[in-house]
Amino acid sequence: MIRFINRIHAGHLRWPYSTFWLGLFILSSMMVACTPKPVWKSYHPVSQDSYPGVHWEKADYPEQLGWSSEKLALARNFSKAIGSDGVMIVDNGIVVDAWGDISRNYQCHSMRKSILSALIGIHVEKGDIDLSATIGELGIDDRYPSLSATEKKATVGDLIMARSGVYHPALGEAASMKGMRPKRHSHAPGTFWYYNNWDFNALGTIFELETGTRIFEEFDRRVADPLQMEDFNVGNCKYLSWSDYRSAPYSIHDYYLFRMSARDLARFGLLFLRQGRWKSQQIISSEWIRESTANHSEWGQDGGYGYMWWTGIHGGLLPNVSLKAHSYLASGYGGHKLIVLPFRNLVIVHRVNTDSVGRRPMSHQIGRLLWLILSAAGEGDIGPDPSIAAAAGKKLDQTDLKRLLKNGSRWMIPNKGIFMGGRHLVISCTTDGTMLFCPYEETEFKGKWWISGDRFYFKILGLRSYFELIRNGNFITLFDATGTMFGEFEAPSI
């Protein structure tokens, strides 16, 4: 019934302008206030793989599935500390635990890319999309300065792997993405990986041209309906053009904005965990699932990238937790994560209310949350406890910090999934209080640093916070305001 009502098109209404916006405000407020409370189906142990029906099946208590309620409480408390708004944990198709607002259709941000990847996979199988076709052959271009003949040699496959070599301004770029965007024409198609919103937006254009469908409606038909998603609503999704952004670059390729609830994203994640099969129906080919979540590019020291899915190598995927291969996730601005762990038959969803101003959990914090969740599952081979409470060594006091930074300091931190960039993140602190953050050799962000008490404060990329530093032997470890490890560097003598 809810999904039927959601299909009513508000565009047919003809209200006076001011009344329309007042009504829209009241309606949206009511929708937030009336977010449906999750309905759970009672858990009944079965030997085969479980799938949700109209509602998810939930264990009466975590110990039914071999989990620790006490350790899950630690995860829940930490998620509140970092600003999480919804968490859902699914073990072999059964909900172990969930908290926060898991039925609200939050923005997906860049998780949209993994969703589009799934739709592309369906239409590659149907023969509608050819990954080897060049964007020139498909008639893809952009506003001035338009694409060169070389750029038009990029294939659809290059775009889906973020290797197009087209560095035209794009919609929806964060400040960090703009700052790290390579110079135009600096890399040939297929030769260099860069997390490129132009590629992702142009793929939306290509998808609709080649399939003759609209992205949101096609997702509703091909995925949401057969998976019996409880909250997904095409009317909540929308396209954003350059006219919707302030000071936006001139690009003809729209940003396709998905909204989805945690419990519906968990169904999408379970579909991938089950190799594209939902009960008796093969919705996405298992070959596409394997290919799209494989490592096609590498970044940092243990990060990989597939077909618009983030992957891990050497135990990586998120900072502060060690994972077995092959694990992968969809990621969106502000801390949105859909994590799929086939080695443990788990799907974990993390949501944040990015419609309002508030804390934005960072990757190293979500990695610690995942560490706590896996600890509650009884996993032992997940790396050391990344909390400051478990750290060995001496905490640097104000005198130590002043000595460390007296003549400036340069910290080279191994980039283990901390920030999209190269193998090391470099933080340089000059004597005048300037802080430089370099995720790549040729990319630099400028901020400020200062010392107050026994804390190293900083303000950069819109973030104001602090680190506490602990020295253990030849290394100094940085811990953030939540007591979570950020990274470590080889310690100079002080």
Positions of predicted regions on the chain:
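Active-site SXXK
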Residues: 93, 107-132, 159, 203-207, ...
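N-terminal leader/targeting segments and the immediately adjacent pre-domain N-terminus
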Residues: 2-8, 19, 24-28, 34-102, ...
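Lipid interaction determinants
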Residues: 387-494
